[in-house]
Every structure is written in structure tokens, then in C-alpha cells.
Amino acid sequence: MTRRYFGTDGIRGQSNVFPMTPDLAMKVGIAVGTILRRGHHRHRVVIGKDTRLSGYMLETALVAGFTAAGLDVFLLGPIPTPAVAMLTRSLRADIGVMVSASHNPFADNGIKLFGPDGYKLSDELEAEIEALLNQEAPLPLARAEDIGRAKRVDGDIYRYIEFVKRTLPRDVTLSGLRIAIDCANGAAYKVAPTALWELGAEVVTIGNEPNGLNINLECGSTHPAALQKKVHEVRADIGIALDGDADRVIIVDETGAIVDGDQLMAVIAESWANDQTLKGGGIVATVMSNLGLERFLGGKGLTLARTKVGDRHVVEHMRQNHYNIGGEQSGHIVLSDFGTTGDGLVAALQILAAVKRTGKTVSQICHRFDPVPQLLRNVRISGGKPLEDSFVRQAIADAESELARNGRLVIRPSGTEPLIRVMAEGDDRSQIERIVNDLIGVIANSREAA
């Protein structure tokens, strides 16, 4: 079934433009309440948000929908996505909601839903919600005496801070480390600096003055230049860049070099393998992770299981096959020993633990392998299915044959835009560039792409 509302990470769009409107948000609350009311107990929802201006509007609309359907609502205020997942479990809620568009600009927003176990909702439950949202008849509301109550939860960020601190091994403190952290003017602007300081670090913070409009604006994990500058300026031992909802992280070493999610997963996997706490015999990543990571892990006797793009697919594979490390090159790192979703701060603490235990610098710890040349380009299409064209399929087969064991080819349609993404990687950069350019030409000229 073609989905109208839910994408790969909940419902997302530009604020006050369908589907990210207050009337739809209210209807989401009523639809979820309609499904939950099939049980017999009083139901509870927790709602968190990042710092976008539209967050207040959407939060209020969701509260109206949930309470109208007879659900009680706990409001967490600005708080990271992984905190919502954690508090959904801790507060014994039936549903957790995060109002955020992650690393996107302030004008966008989204609604992510978590089940009582802290994991994102199943495809089947999202489809059930979709069906109710598409229903023309009014959804049933609670009787007057059964309308839900809403209240602000005091101290929720401190519960999360204590949770984060407990993920650092007890034999490790951060004393003696100068840490620069960029909170992206987002959801972690209070919790991240506080947690690091309470663990003993000297903390220099940027991106901690949200005004509703500046989330992810030239800051955070997708714009690390400001953090690189700050690391040099204060001679920090490490820089930590979070995104707007703090579910992803990028590290900057003491020289100012960027460390992406692939390198971070390599560090954590090697450390946990040495401690004999790694599960599954390897890690889970997406098809976009660098071939260098796969080779590095293979050299350690570990495997790399690949999934489709999206942390949802990574987490699903981890759960089904009992892995405890997974993630994406972009910095979504999922450590299932601690949580159910990507958590930038928790992942950063595992890197800091490796630094403290070895006595080495971040640059010595974090650059575990040399990435092979990787090239990603997009082809804009106006319709059709060019990947089903016989000429395109033959060109792809020829390219895969040419790369053989010396590289990889990933070609996939974008999930959000009319684009075909072409990624190739291998040891020979000139070969990679030629293959990608040739494939772009074939796809663009396909009759199916017109």
C-alpha cells in the first residue's frame, strides 16, 4: 500500500504545510487513541520535542487529539529523541511521541512514534494509523468523563542525564579532558553539557542558545565547521557534534579532523570485542557504509551485516539477529545494550571511554581504517522507473562486473525526492568516477526517466 503520511522516520514535512499541520497532528492523536482504547486500562502517552518554533504548535495539537481520545499525556518539553524512547519505557507509557525533524532546518518538523518497548512502531501499526487518518467518517471521541488529562513532567531531563552517565564504565571518569560540544541549538542543549560536566570533564559548549529558528543552522553534526574552529581555539581534546534531536553524533579529533559514524562504529566494535561484550560476531550498518569498514572488521575476525538505508532497518536487523552495535555513516549509532534508538551522547561516551582507558589521543583512537574512495551523485527524474529499463539494468550489471571484488555499487531511488542515488566505491578513484558518470548518463537518458 502506498503511504500518504508515514515515511521512513515517521511523519515529516514543512511546518503548516500538509501533512505537518496542527489539524493532522490532532487527528494522529485521536487515531492512536482509537487504536489503544481497544484495551481495557487507562492509557498514557509521553511527548517530547526539540527546539523548533513549530514544536509548541504541534505539541498542543497532539495533546488535544490524545486527550480527546481519552488518553493521559505527560509532556517532557525539549528533550533528545533517545530520551523519549527511554522515558516511554520508564514511565510505563503505551506510546511515546517525539516532535522533531532531526537534522533538518527549523522550518521542517516531524512526528515520530514509539511503542511501549521504546522501539519505533511496526509497519503494521503505522498502516493501521494511516487507515484511520484516511477515513472520511469522524473518529470516535471519549465521553466527557473519560477525557484525558495532560501534565508537565518535572525532572525528566535529569532522569535521562543519570541514564546517560550510567552508560560510561564505572572505572572511567572524564577528569582531565577538555571537551568542546556542539548541541546544534537543539534538544540536547541542556542535557549534554550537564552530563559531561558531571562526569568530570571540562566542557566548552556551542550551539546551546536555541531561539526556535536556529536549530541545525550552521551548527551540529551536519555543519561541523564551527566545532572544528572551537576545538582549535580552546585546544580541546575532542569535539562532539550532535544534531537537532541528538540521535546522531560526529566527532572532531584534537587536530580538527572529522570522524564519521563508520569510524566510530569501528572503535566501539573493536573495544567491545576486546572486552568480550560484542554480540553477533560483528556489527550492522547500511549499504552506504564504507568498504574500508568492512575490510577493517574482517581483519579482526568480525562481520559487517548490511541493510537498506535508515536506522529503522538497522535496528530491525539488530533485534532479529542479536547484534548490539549498529549504525550509519551519518552518525546514527545504536547500542542496544543501552537503548532502542540512535543516541549521540551515549555513543560519544563509548569513544571517551576508549580514550581514557588507552591513554591515547582521539586521533590515535578514532582513525581505525583508511576509507576507500566513495562517490555519491544523484540523478533527478521526472517520473517512471528508470531502474527497470533494460539498458539501465545492463549498464548496472556491467559496472558491477567491472568492480568485482575491488569495490561496490549501490543504486537506489530516494525515499523523499524524485532522485536516483548512484554510489560507487573502490580502490581506484578514477575508475569510480568514470563508472558513476557513465551510469548517471544512462539513467538520465532512459525513456523511463523522462
Curated annotation (Swiss-Prot):
GO terms for biological process: carbohydrate metabolic process; peptidoglycan biosynthetic process; UDP-N-acetylglucosamine biosynthetic process. Its EC number is 5.4.2.10. The modification Phosphoserine is found at S102. It catalyses: alpha-D-glucosamine 1-phosphate = D-glucosamine 6-phosphate. Activated by phosphorylation. The keyword Phosphoprotein applies. Mg(2+) binds at S102, D243, D245, D247. Keywords: Isomerase, Magnesium, Metal-binding, Phosphoprotein. Pfam families: PGM_PMM_I, PGM_PMM_II, PGM_PMM_III, PGM_PMM_IV. Belongs to the phosphohexose mutase family. This is Phosphoglucosamine mutase. The lineage of its organism: Bacteria, Pseudomonadati, Pseudomonadota, Alphaproteobacteria, Hyphomicrobiales. The gene is glmM.
